[in-house]
Amino acid sequence: SPAMPVPGPMGPMGPRGPPGSPGASGPQGFGPAGPPGKNGEDGESGKPGRGGERGPPGPQGARGFSGLDGAKGDSGPAGPKGESGAPGENGTPGAMGPRGAAGAAGARGNDGAAGAAGPPGPTGPAGPPGFPGGPGAKGDAGAQGGRGPEGPAGARGEPGNPGPAGAAGPSGNPGTDGAAGPKGTPGAAGVAGAPGFPGPRGPSGPQGAAGAPGPKGEAGAKGEAGAPGVQGPPGPSGEEGKRGARGEPGAAGARGGPGGRGFPGTDGPAGPKGATGERGAPGAVGPKGATGEPGRTGEPGLPGAKGMTGSPGSPGPDGKTGPAGPSGQDGRPGPPGPVGARGQPGVMGFPGPKGAAGEGGKPGERGPSGPAGPAGERGEQGPAGAPGFQGLPGPQGALGETGKPGEQGLPGEAGATGPAGARGDRGFPGERGAKGDAGAPGAPGAQGPPGLQGMPGERGAAGLPGLRGDRGDQGAKGADGAPGKDGPRGLTGPLGLPGPAGATGDKGESGPAGAVGPAGARGAPGERGESGPPGPAGFAGPPGADGQPGAKGEAGDNGAKGDAGPPGAAGPTGAPGPQGPVGNTGAKGARATGFPGAAGRVGPPGPSGNPGPPGPAGGPGKEGPKGNRGETGPAGRPGELGAAGPPGPAGEKGSPGSEGATGSAGLPGPQGLAGQRGLPGQRGERGFPGLPGPSGEAGGPSGPGGERGPPGPMGPPGLAGAPGEPGREGSPGNEGSAGRDGAAGPKGDRGESGPSGAPGAPGPPGAPGPVGPAGKNGDRGETGPAGPAGSAGPSGPRGPAGAPGLRGDKGESGEAGERRGFTGMQGPPGPSGSSGEQGPAGAAGPAGPRGPAGSAGSPGKDGMSGLPGPTGPPGPRSGEMGPAGPPGPPGPPGAPGAPGGGFDLGFLSQPQEKAPDPFRDRDLEVDSTLKSLSQQLEQLRSPDGTRSKPEDVNLQLTFLRNSVAYMDASAGNLKKATSRLPLLDLAPMDVGAPDQEFGLEVGPVCFL
């Protein structure tokens, strides 16, 4: 049979064939999703996306560090006055102040022993003239005198009887105008003028100080959302990788900059005890030690320098009346007697020459204001005012509407993939991962620079005192310290034991008399002590006080006649005196008679014409002849009161009246203005000593001993040591020789007054004091015996002419003269002629008497402020301090004022006519204040003579009365507000001597 092919064993595997073509896709499997694959490597960072929309505001950050201090801002305006702080602790005591002013005079000391009589004083001034003596006894008849010289020619005889009347002369020319008459009485005050136009706008004031920075504004409202950005191309979304493992710690970074100023740390624990410090500076003077035992009595000091001459003692008692002096010379003629009765009118004189032109009259009083003028043209525009203060921030505006969203843009075409870019910027940090494990601590960094000094922490509580340190080795002796400053004056130590009496010093001059001390309470009588040895002679005591007035002395002799005193003030006109003797014949008159006129016949009387207007006053006619002496007329009425004479000299100051009863206490006045800030208070007392410092470090080893230095200066005396135990009594030593006088020690503090010494022997008489003031006039002495008649004085001046004597009897006719007499004077006027034509109008007559005052007009409009008046006369030097007023309510804080200059008080002196009271209801407190003020004003106007209100005070309150007025709403009239100004009148004598300049600065005035 044909051989059957038998399969051989499998051959080796052939090589791999080429891949077949892909099969068709299998059906979609439905298995569950497999687990996510492992993270791939981080891809390269994509390009940064476009900025997203603005996120919502983040949470409030932690508080930042304090910034550096800003520059100093401008000073803000003064704030309102704060409430008074609590009183500070007392400061350390100040240095000893300068010596205080002399204290008030001490009380009067006891009367000293009477001094020896001084030498007679200088001759005093002549006493006042004595009273005239009585008439002396009639003298013996003198020897017959020789014949006197021929007397002067007698006075001219009286003129003869008047001759017959001559014919009427022609009418004289009119006389010259008379001198201007006296100024008429001022007319009534004019009506107040209309108010003036407003003044031009004043220049702008200086720019005010910058205001304080305003408070920080509130946070603004959240801004609107921005418009949506353009949509970016969509990025490929990678899955977020898991957080990688924590990396190794990096190398130490570069040294950081100094950190910001940290907050103050809490107090650290107390550090270890430090090394001993260097020796500290000498400490402050410790508190005064206990008073040491009294020192030994010092050596007597050198005699003091001669004291100053004491002030003159008070005048001694009046001496006895001296013997009568010789008669003085006749005094000067006395003052003129009182005005006599008014004489009869004299004869008409000649016309005098034309008088000189009178001085210009005083300017008339201010006339009434004229009618208002027409309105002026409109003024130019004034300059721009200063910029105003910055306004307050306005209210927050309303929110605007939200904008409409923009339209969406078209998507762009996809671009070709670009090449891979460079590595992008670091992406934004992912959300915060969980906290990793703590890494190993890094190596310590280099020490940073010291930070800024932190603010000091609060003061820690005082630590417990450390344990007492070991005592250090004794250091080398330090150099002598400078003597410490004088400590504060210690309290007065107890009185030491009295030392032995010092050597008697040179006798000083008498000291001034002390003032009288207050009488002490009477002590109980002590037991009688043993009589001590007489003390050394004391200084002469001050002169005693004036003794009681002595008994009335015997009448002294008349003193010398004094000089005539100055004429007194004219007294009131007396009643008419008795008729005086006939006066001497007057001198011969001038002879100026006219020529004789022909005697006219007397015409028949004409009918009486109409009275013409008064003609101008004719000139005075010539002097007529002296008529026969008339009979004595009846006594005239008392003359008018003469003009006041010059003021007499000031009278002596009267003695003060007895003290009046104490008035009831006034009501409290209104509160005064706030005073200026007071001076700083005195330095407070010394603080307590501080805690002891830690013990110092042991000093170095002692150096080799130096050579002994020269002795150092004497150190300040140490504090008194504690008293040692008493030693045993030593045996008495030999008496040493007296040491040299020591230098005078510094002046010690004033000791307390010692007990009074025994009265000393009278000292030598002091130098004569200055002449004491003249004593008061003594009582009027009794009339002394008549003195011898004085020699005749020179004849006095010719007295005034007496009143005309009684009319004498008619004399017998004289013999015919040798020559014919002068032609007689013009005869009396004839009877009236027929009426003439009406004459020209006469000159205006003198002003008539002032009419009665019209009824009060309604109050005028406000007048313009008057000019400042003159400064008033000086007020008294010192007023009494008024009672404290009730505290007022605190005022609102004022705006800061502009710096003010001084201004003149004088503006108050003009009356301001109208100031309506802004507050109608006046409360009780104001009423009571007004009442007490008016009482005080009344006491000032009529003082009661007590020491606090003497009678001769002249207070110038007039300006105060006229200064201010207010409207009384109830009655509707103006009242002077005498009590509404919170200041009294000031006069220059209140602020210094009359020749000193002084200024015043017055703040704004508040009305009640």
Curated annotation (Swiss-Prot):
Pro residues composition-biased segments: 1-21, 119-132, 604-617, 761-771, 884-896
Major place of residence: secreted
Domain Fibrillar collagen NC1 per the UniProt entry, residue ranges: 978-1008
Composition-biased stretches (Gly residues): 133-151, 253-265, 696-709
Bilayer-crossing regions: none
Bias type Low complexity, positions: 92-117, 152-195, 204-230, 339-354, 410-422, 437-456, 489-524, 537-573, 634-661, 717-735, 785-806, 832-868
The keyword Lyase belongs to this UniProt entry's keyword annotation: no
Gene Ontology MF, one: extracellular matrix structural constituent
Protein name: Collagen, type I, alpha 1a
